[in-house]
From Swiss-Prot:
This is UPF0434 protein RL4569. Disulfide bonds: none annotated. Gene3D superfamilies: 2.20.25.10. GO terms for cellular component: cytosol. InterPro entries: Trm112-like.
């Protein structure tokens, strides 16, 4: 994966929230996803763009 596309600007993380829980997101570099611990969802990042659709999110296993 392109190193430039596998990073998320910390300022972006300050602005984005989970569309379901409205909670903060964290970046999972291994899976290239934005994670909402509160909603237990992971939103994919494709071509450097976060896909903030619940229909595209992956449920986190316990």
């Amino acid at each position: 994966m392109d190193e430039k596309l596998s990073r998320v600007d910390p300022k972006l993380l300050d602005l984005l929230v989970c569309p379901l829980s409205k909670g903060r997101l964290s970046y999972d570099r291994e899976h290239n996803e934005l994670v909402s611990e509160k909603a237990r969802l992971a939103y994919p990042i494709r071509d450097g763009i976060p896909i903030m659709l619940m229909s595209e999110a992956r449920r986190l296993d316990d």
